[in-house]
């Protein structure tokens, strides 16, 4: 018997991811749908990956590629901490991702958002594109769902948001992306990072913000 066509497709994080600076830290958010072609392989994937104690990344693109890169960077940061007896900066982690993505740009499909808190810069967000460029931004969005929400994010973002304002901004942005993008869906996962540590939240699909649906 011939195998289904979707078995020949790579597992893909066709996705909606974002990270936003607020007054005191950063908030990262992602949907949870993983696709293999048109087939939904996983409805509850965790696309927010810990890299160090207060540094996380959001992954989009090939699931295998982004997981492998994350493992490499986590290892290098552990070595960094052991050798220097000091916590790494968010920029250090982002630079490692950028180096790996750029050096292997012809072989990888990986879009990464790195965010976290360190004692030098506080909360910061870095966007590493598919080609390996790195840009520091007050907020970053990525994945297939991001194409639907650029205008919304540009109009609603404001510097120095409070924690609650930032959570609402991230939830609404991702809910809009998930509604429009067929490769995004499931639940919204949030990761709130500040000087006190990391807080994880999950918003089930039936509790997502509702907008006009026609």
UniProtKB/Swiss-Prot annotation:
Entry EC number(s): 3.4.25.1
Keywords, in A-Z order: Cytoplasm, Hydrolase, Nucleus, Protease, Proteasome, Threonine protease, Zymogen
CDD domains: proteasome_beta_type_6
UniProt-annotated catalytic positions: 15
Residues that make up the propeptide removed upon maturation: 1-14
Any one GO MF annotation of this record: endopeptidase activity
Localization (cell): Cytoplasm; Nucleus
Reaction catalyzed: Cleavage of peptide bonds with very broad specificity
Family: Belongs to the peptidase T1B family.
Quaternary data: The 26S proteasome consists of a 20S proteasome core and two 19S regulatory subunits. The 20S proteasome core is composed of 28 subunits that are arranged in four stacked rings, resulting in a barrel-shaped structure. The two end rings are each formed by seven alpha subunits, and the two central rings are each formed by seven beta subunits. The catalytic chamber with the active sites is on the inside of the barrel.
Protein name: Proteasome subunit beta type-6
Organism: Dictyostelium discoideum
Upper taxonomic lineage: Eukaryota, Amoebozoa, Evosea, Eumycetozoa, Dictyostelia
Gene name of this polypeptide: psmB6
């Amino acid at each position: 018997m011939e195998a289904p066509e979707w078995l020949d497709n790579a597992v893909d994080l066709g996705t909606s991811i974002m990270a936003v600076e607020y007054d005191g830290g950063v908030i990262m958010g992602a949907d949870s749908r993983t696709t293999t072609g048109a087939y939904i392989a996983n409805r509850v994937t965790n696309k927010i990956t810990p890299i160090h104690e207060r540094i996380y990344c959001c992954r989009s693109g090939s699931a295998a590629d982004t997981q492998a890169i994350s493992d490499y960077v986590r290892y290098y940061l552990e070595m960094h901490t052991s050798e220097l007896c000091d916590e790494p900066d968010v920029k250090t982690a982002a630079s490692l991702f950028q180096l790996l993505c750029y050096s292997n740009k012809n072989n990888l499909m990986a879009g990464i958002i790195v965010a976290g808190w360190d004692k030098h810069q506080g909360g910061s967000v870095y966007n590493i594109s598919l080609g390996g460029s790195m840009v520091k931004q007050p907020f970053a969005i990525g994945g297939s769902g991001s194409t639907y929400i650029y205008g919304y994010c540009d109009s609603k973002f404001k510097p120095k948001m409070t924690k609650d304002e930032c959570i609402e901004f991230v939830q609404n942005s991702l809910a809009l992306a998930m509604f429009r993008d067929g490769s995004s869906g499931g639940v919204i996962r949030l990761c709130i990072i500040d000087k006190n540590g990391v807080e994880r939240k999950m918003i089930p699909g039936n509790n997502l913000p509702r907008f006009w649906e026609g």
